[in-house]
Amino acid sequence: MERIRDDTMKKKLIGLALSAAMLFSVLSVPAFAAVPEESADPALTTEQTAAEEENCFFTSSSTEEEKEPNSITYVALGDSICAGIGLTTVQYAHNLMGVDVSFNFKGYPETCYVGQVGKSLNLDRDHAINLGLPGVMSKDMLELVKTGTMAEMNTLSGCQYNYPEFVDYIKSADIISIQLGSNDAFVPTVVSFGEATNWKSEDLASIVLSGNLRGSSKETEDALNESLKKLSLTRSEKDAVWNLFFSGMNKICENAYPESSSNLRQIVATVKELNPDAQILIIGATNPVPLLPSWSNYFSKLNNYEKQLADVYGATYVSIPFAQTELDGHPTVSGHKYIADKIVKAIEAQQ
């Protein structure tokens, strides 16, 4: 009975997280729009559907001459951004989200930034490992890099990962990237959103989970509009949502920063201790909702802290201010390519 309750809670939290991402999209703009336009990469401004974008990637890839695989090993630690969630080619079972995504460690989509870094460095799937975990918060990753297991379920995100091989992956890597911190603010916001609306999100969550939102079909658009109509809120629920977005988030972000910065420091220190010879890259964050001052302030402080952290531990900070994101808050294929290019440049600069 306890197992059933846990599974139900996980599904509710994961579904709500995706639903809340849609609500945030009302306030979202492409991440690179918040910075000077002349600095933006023109390649990222081309409008394409997700399928067209990924098809272009695979078409261009097939014409290149094959090279001998490199012998170095790249390991990426991160959350759903790292995992490639949102890409049309990502493979995962919804009932295993937050529980077991080990199939994505080597079976990740070629278009995610881990896949594109691997391609640029001529790494096969045994030498480019994607340890991106959807829903993971910095405190969860700290447990995983130390012991390979989460002692208990994260009741906010609904995830509980257990991978004893985590430590071995870190020890065997030549290059390790760390991309974390977004969920420390996002997950508590999601839970607060659910409480404010009395969890009226089932239909919307179903559409988001289908993966069709990155397409452009009228059928998906109509279904989305219908689900939004069903998300009818009472006056008190509307007031609660309003208070969340315009005051509650300030407190959430203020509380998130001390924890995320402390956990990130311990994660980097632990990784450094496990593998002192590895090149460590700390990947900055892109704010998917720059119109919310509380989030902009959180990500600004987090990025500044990560720069300092990199200096202290002899790591490399990789800034990604122009990473294009979709309505679900995750990078597009172009966004992943941009992140990958920045990572590859950082790696090559140290060689």
Q: Can you name each region flagged by the protein language model?
A:
Residues A34, I85-T89, M141-E143, V187-S192:
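Short, solvent-exposed loop/turn and secondary-structure capping segments
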Residues V26-A43:
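Sec-dependent signal peptide cleavage junction
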Residues S19-V26:
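Bacterial N-terminal signal peptides
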Residues M1-T8:
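Short, Lys/Arg-enriched N-terminal segments with co-localized hydrophobic residues
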Residues K11-S19:
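Sec-dependent signal peptide recognition
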Residues T49-P134, A223-N225, T332:
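Serine-esterase "nucleophile elbow" of acetyl-processing enzymes
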Residues N154-Q350:
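Alpha-helical cap/lid subdomain in secreted, periplasmic
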Residues P134-Q160, P331:
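Charged, often glycine-rich, active-site loop that binds/positions anionic groups
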